[in-house]
Design a protein with these regions (language model features):
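Helix-to-loop junction immediately C-terminal to a conserved catalytic motif
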Residues: 53
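ABC ATPase NBD coupling module
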Residues: 69-83, 107, 112-113
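ATP-binding/catalytic-site motifs of ATP-hydrolyzing domains
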Residues: 62-64, 68
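The feature captures the beta-strand-to-loop junction immediately N-terminal to the Walker
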Residues: 38-40
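Short helical segment in ABC ATPase nucleotide-binding domains corresponding to the A-loop/adjacent helical element
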Residues: 98-106, 116, 120
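Conserved ABC ATPase signature
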Residues: 136-141, 145
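Hydrophobic anchor residue at the start of the ABC signature
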Residues: 151
Length: 154
């Protein structure tokens, strides 16, 4: 579960004025749900995501993951346990689809069989046949198919 309470990010511009990039965002994403931040360019979507995974610090407000305030969490552990998809798909072109999907599980020490099982399960969730696609490379898939891989990798 992700909960944002009055999340704010302000930047000081060159002229000394303060710019509110994110202004008191409140959001609840229940466990197991996907959430889409949709809006025009420059409205704070990416800034909000960067605050959730602590690439940048909020100016105000709180971020909770599974009920725990993330302020004092270890950033490496935090980032390994959350994922998000950005507009740019960001698949590794030199890795197969299976390797792309299992990057984080392999970093966490999962064995090969468990990784394969999880990749197969995730492929089925996005209506892509694992037998057809797991051994392919991103360039061998359409943009929409690649985007789905990005979603399940997150």
């Amino acid at each position: 579960m992700i909960k944002l309470e009055n999340l704010t990010k302000q930047f000081v511009q060159k002229n000394g004025q303060t710019f509110n990039a994110v202004d008191n965002v409140n959001l609840n994403v229940p466990e197991g749900e996907m959430c889409v931040l949709l809006g025009p360019s420059g409205c704070g979507k990416t800034t909000t995501l960067k605050m959730i995974n602590r690439l940048i610090a909020p100016s105000g407000g709180k971020i909770f993951i599974n009920g725990e305030d993330t302020t004092d969490l270890d950033t490496v552990t935090l980032r390994r346990n959350i994922g998000y998809v950005i507009q740019q798909i960001g698949l590794f072109p030199n890795m197969t689809i299976e390797e792309n999907i299992t990057v984080v599980p392999r970093m966490l020490g999962w064995d090969k069989a468990r990784c394969k099982e999880r990749a197969t399960e995730l492929m089925a969730m996005v209506a892509l046949d694992p037998k057809r696609f797991l051994n392919r490379y991103p360039k061998e898939m359409s943009g929409g198919q690649q985007q789905r891989i990005g979603v399940i990798r997150a």
